[in-house]
UniProtKB/Swiss-Prot annotation:
EC number: 3.5.1.110
Family (UniProt): Belongs to the isochorismatase family. RutB subfamily.
Reaction(s) catalysed (UniProt annotation): (Z)-3-ureidoacrylate + H2O + H(+) = (Z)-3-aminoacrylate + NH4(+) + CO2; (Z)-3-ureidoacrylate + H2O = (Z)-3-aminoacrylate + carbamate + H(+); (Z)-2-methylureidoacrylate + H2O + H(+) = (Z)-2-methylaminoacrylate + NH4(+) + CO2
Task of the protein: Hydrolyzes ureidoacrylate to form aminoacrylate and carbamate. The carbamate hydrolyzes spontaneously, thereby releasing one of the nitrogen atoms of the pyrimidine ring as ammonia and one of its carbon atoms as CO2.
Protein source organism: Shigella flexneri serotype 5b (strain 8401)
InterPro entries (UniProt xref): Isochorismatase-like_dom, Isochorismatase-like_hydrls, Isochorismatase-like_sf, RutB
Active site as annotated: 25 (proton acceptor), 134, 167 (nucleophile)
Residue stretches in coiled coil: none
Induction annotation: Up-regulated by the nitrogen regulatory protein C (NtrC also called GlnG) and repressed by RutR.
Protein name per the record: Ureidoacrylate amidohydrolase RutB
Length: 231
């Protein structure tokens, strides 16, 4: 059953049962003091409301029959998957750079099985959800995401998570290139860096690659009364 979500730059209509909510990298690394972003000098002091908003959005999406996909960014304990000096990721990943500057952190940041890699305690995948590891910013790179979506007839993706200007935007952009419709819930995301990075990412998304809405509006669009209005 179709519903219409009020968004910028215009409303978008979708069928929740042929849509997915993508939760990007809600790991201790990105959302918890003592995690990678915090240790690398990024401000994570305002992530708690984002976690609560994601909880709300996921609950509404699951109740409406949307597929929930959780991403965890990181690599094996030896960081082979991160790439060596021949990879730009080796030079640009702030996690890898932080560990080179602080060798005592080696093996602790974004390593699979570590506390840093784990999802935050408040966000727990449920049976029927899909949890995917990803080795780079985009959730489409070297993962089965596109085939998972296409095999289920899913074309509309609703994004939440961290960081808006890095992994969220990268995944939404790649989805756009693969003919997926991407919506980001702005109050269920958080940037890495200054506030202008959040504003710039949202501007890019709503102007060039997708749509921007918020959690309250999203939940309202999934309510039974909204389906009744469309019907």
């Amino acid at each position: 059953m179709m519903t219409t979500l009020t968004a910028r730059p215009e409303a978008i209509t979708f069928d929740p049962q042929q849509s997915a909510q993508i939760v990007v990298d809600m790991q201790n690394a990105y959302a918890t003091p003592g995690g990678y972003l915090d240790l690398a000098g990024f401000d994570v002091s305002t992530t708690r409301p984002v976690i609560a908003n994601i909880q709300t959005a996921v609950t509404a999406a699951r109740a409406a029959g949307m597929l929930i996909i959780w991403f965890q960014n990181g690599w094996d304990e030896q960081y082979v998957e991160a790439g060596g000096p021949g990879s730009p990721n080796f030079h640009k990943s702030n996690a890898l750079k932080t560990m080179r500057k602080q060798p005592q952190l080696q093996g602790k940041l974004l390593a699979k099985g570590s506390w840093d890699y784990q999802l935050v305690d408040e966000l727990v995948p449920q049976p029927g959800d899909i949890v995917l590891p990803k080795p780079r910013y985009s959730g489409f790179f070297n993962t089965p995401l596109d085939s998972i979506l296409r095999s289920r007839g899913i074309r509309h993706l609703v994004f939440t998570g961290i960081a808006t200007n890095v992994c969220v935007e990268s995944t939404l952009r790649d989805g756009f290139f693969l003919e997926h419709f991407g919506v980001v819930l702005e109050d269920a995301t958080h940037q890495a860096g200054p506030e202008f990075a959040q504003k710039a990412a949202l501007f890019n998304i709503e102007t060039f690659f997708g749509w921007v809405s918020d959690v309250e509006t999203f939940c309202d669009a999934l309510s039974p009364t909204s389906f009744a209005r469309i019907a």
